[in-house]
């Protein structure tokens, strides 16, 4: 099977599964955006995905994403920055990302605001909420109170368009409870801005649980692209 047929088959399978999960949750398939996480995969795959109708791709490595976007022919894609962000990468990230999912501290808001002002740009953002029962430094995410304070900071600057909240299920915990909590933070956020209703949650292992709890943006990698095989 050639690569485009493989991707087509994977996409069909994923869309059918997402549709089934939406039906079980009493939701519309059209209300869910599937982000194809293309990190570590070549620009040729992104071009093929675009040919197959994919509209959203996700990357978490700045240098890789910037180089890849320059090699992708489609201009109709929305590029999502989904990984933890170091402040020294912000200037570069705004050159390729349309949406940032991991705003989790005030320092990041301030640096993005400064760089966006210099570039004369604006950007869509999600505030990342830490869903680990015991917060881990390397996982990213703000506490509930911090997330709401970050949302207020984002809303006070016209360079940002606040989309909603983002979360990553705990490595060793109850994904359903975690996503229920994220949904409750989303409701609180919407008291600040009723239009910031999006929930970025759900990856290849837990997207059905995320859909049940209101996820609007799924970040799916291996289900669409497959698994990397390494030699040596």
How would you name each of these model-derived features?
Residues 215-232:
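Gly/Pro- and small hydrophobic-enriched strand-loop and loop-to-helix capping segments
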Residues 1-205, 211-213, 225-227:
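Conserved alpha/beta-domain cores
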């Amino acid at each position: 099977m050639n690569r485009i047929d493989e991707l087509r088959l994977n996409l069909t399978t994923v869309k059918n599964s997402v549709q089934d999960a939406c039906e079980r949750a009493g939701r519309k398939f059209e209300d869910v955006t599937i982000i194809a996480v293309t990190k570590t995969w070549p620009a040729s795959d992104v071009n093929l995905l675009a040919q197959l109708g994919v509209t959203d791709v996700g990357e978490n490595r700045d240098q890789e994403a910037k180089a890849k976007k320059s090699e992708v022919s489609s201009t109709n894609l929305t590029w999502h920055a989904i990984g933890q962000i170091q402040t020294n990468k912000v200037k570069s990230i705004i050159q390729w990302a349309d949406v940032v999912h991991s705003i989790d501290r005030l320092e990041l808001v301030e640096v993005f605001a400064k760089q966006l002002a210099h570039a004369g740009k604006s950007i869509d953002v999600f505030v990342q909420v830490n869903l680990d029962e015991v917060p881990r430094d390397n996982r990213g995410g703000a506490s509930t109170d911090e997330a709401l304070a970050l949302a207020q900071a984002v809303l006070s600057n016209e360079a940002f368009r606040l989309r909603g909240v983002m979360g990553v299920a705990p490595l060793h915990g109850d994904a359903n409870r975690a996503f229920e909590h994220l949904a409750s933070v989303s409701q609180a956020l919407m008291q600040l801005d009723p239009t910031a209703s999006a929930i970025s949650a759900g990856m290849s292992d837990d997207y059905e649980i995320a859909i049940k709890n209101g996820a609007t943006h799924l970040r799916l990698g291996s289900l669409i692209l497959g698994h990397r095989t390494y030699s040596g």
